[in-house]
Amino acid sequence: GLGSDSSGIMILLEDAPIGMPLKEYLGVNDVVFELEITPNRPDCLSHIGIARELGAYYNKEVNYPSTEINGETGEKTEDNIKVEIENSNLSKRYVARIIKNVTVKESPAWLKERVESIGIRSINNIVDASNFVMMEMNQPNHTFDFDKIAAGKISVRSAKENEKLVTLDEEERELTTDDIVISDT
């Protein structure tokens, strides 16, 4: 990708061939569609949703990604972490899954390019994979560091009066009681 700073001049390496198209020099070989989805079609707010719609329009079968879980350990997630939905009007379902032996690091180039092409800032391999799956399946999700989850519990609840949080972009945001919070406290 081109990065998020578009405020100035892009400095290329000295060996950049003069006259070569920028997309060729950068190795950008992708098409990005900008779609306007009407409010009555939230099913089209994901890659799979758009694929289904195009498949129906062109009478083509959609190849869905596998949702099979590999590497079962026999250890049950619910034995290690509890999920509590404080009000089922907020969320009908929230599930947890523990994945062990993961190293947080910079995303590989292909993943960075994919998340940035859909307007999401690359953060690291874990957050980027989570965000990409969210956009692929239109399924909100979040990743937690298991070792940092307080009391082994995740709660789905309404925000508290005057509750604040610091988001991944290091901005402090004030919540309202209408906001849904996924919390370990």
Over which residues does each language-model region extend?
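RNA/tRNA-interacting regions in translation and RNA-turnover enzymes
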Residues: 1-185
